[in-house]
Regions:
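Bacterial N-terminal signal peptides that target proteins for export
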Residues: 1-12
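Ser/Thr-rich, low-complexity intrinsically disordered terminal regions
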Residues: 23-171
């Protein structure tokens, strides 16, 4: 336990020194990868391998509370309503893509006529959330899944993001 506490304190001290400019990075690294510059650890996490639409469904949420999804029999903590759209499905996915592209620190990873996958990075430490949208022809809605890669709590960020997108899409 003492070792874990020491590692945590040492890690925080190292980050603070790096951010204040008193510690030199140990290797040449692109500063574009993290909004905070060179950190001694990766806060983006690895891209999940279970993303995408399989048999008309997005992947279920993990048990951690930092995920929301509109499909499946999710508990209230994870459940969120799908996105409604009116008119042509192609126009709806195009409008959704434009909304997502306009959001800060967003990278679109995959885009088709019925699926959109984007990564959103947090402003301060560069934590990455994976957000997927699936234009569900059977339900005439856009199913959504938004999940943080790391940690337990997201302080409601994934739910807030989906609700902001819902509001923009309805305009």
């Amino acid at each position: 336990m003492l070792t874990s506490a020491f590692r945590l304190v040492f890690g925080v001290a190292l980050v603070m020194l790096t951010l204040l400019g008193h510690a030199a990075p140990s290797a040449a690294v692109s500063l574009e990868a993290s909004p905070m510059g060179v950190l001694p650890f990766n806060l983006a996490g690895d891209r999940p391998t279970n993303l995408g639409v399989k048999e008309g469904k997005l992947a279920p949420c993990p048990t951690s509370p930092n995920c929301v999804i509109s499909q499946g029999d999710e508990d209230a903590e994870h459940a969120i309503a799908p996105l409604a759209y009116s008119g042509d499905p192609a126009q709806a996915i195009a409008k959704l893509t434009a909304i997502v592209k306009a959001m800060p620190r967003t990278t679109i990873i995959e885009s088709t006529d019925s699926y959109l996958y984007a990564e959103f990075a947090s402003k301060l430490l560069g934590f990455v959330d994976d957000v997927e949208f699936y234009l569900d022809p059977a339900e005439s809605v856009i199913q959504v899944r938004s999940a943080s890669r790391l940690g337990q709590s997201d302080l409601g960020v994934n739910r807030q993001r989906v609700e902001a997108i819902r509001q923009e899409l309805s305009v």
